[in-house]
C-alpha cells in the first residue's frame, strides 16, 4: 500500500484502467452486465406495447434494464443504482402527468 492507502498497482494504472477497475469492483464485469442488460432489454422489446411507446419511455426502460443489470451483477446495496431507477421512471411520469391532468399520484 502506498500513500493514502492506494495500492501501488492502482497508482501505476492509466486513468481509464483505474476507472474500469473501480467500475468492475462496483458493478461486476462488463461482460456479465452486457449479457444481462441485453437479455432484459430483449424481453422488454417483446412486449405488445413496445411499438406504441414514445422514445422517452423506451429509453427509460432500457436504462432501467442497465441499472438492474448492475444491481444483480455488482453491489446490490449501492443506493445510487436504485436512485437512478426512480429518476428515469419519474422523467416519464412527469411527462405523462402533463398530458394526463386528471392523473393523481397514489
Question: Which stretches of residues belong to each language-model region?
Answer:
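Intrinsically disordered, low-complexity regulatory regions
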Residues: 2-106
